[in-house]
Amino acid sequence: PSGVITDGLGFMYNGCMAVFDPRPGRAGSIAPGKARFSSLCPTLAFKDGQLRLAIGAPGGTQIAMGVTQAIINVIDHDMSMTEAVSAPRFSSTSNLIDVTNRIPRYVQAELEADGYQVFRKPNTFDIAAVHGIRVTEEGWLDGGADPGHDGVAIGV
């Protein structure tokens, strides 16, 4: 978020002007009436017609990467929702691979040895702020909120 609130409106503006290209005449340049792209991806996942997962995140260009990794953690690695949203994440929205500070340094070294450019983020939770609720096979609600950000996941 931008941290900017207009008196009387009661909401905070987003901070996505940063994703525009400041150079004129390019596809992502700032121009009157031009909308920015959106990486919003609120997601509902079903199994045999039953809701099993509701998940989403704020986080600008990092949203899709964060949400995707948390979904993979739940479905493929059988993690609880708290484990899934707390696991280390990476992102690659350009030629650079961004890794959070909790990705082991040997992983970064192996990627760099293979010719990838890697940027280590100084923060431990810096790729989207994923929150979700998993519905277990027994019908229990299992919520998880990214521990690096404000928020809570509550099933009612």
Model-flagged regions — what are they?
Residues P1-T124:
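Proteins synthesized as precursors that undergo proteolytic processing into mature forms
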Residues R102-V156:
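Cofactor-centric catalytic regions
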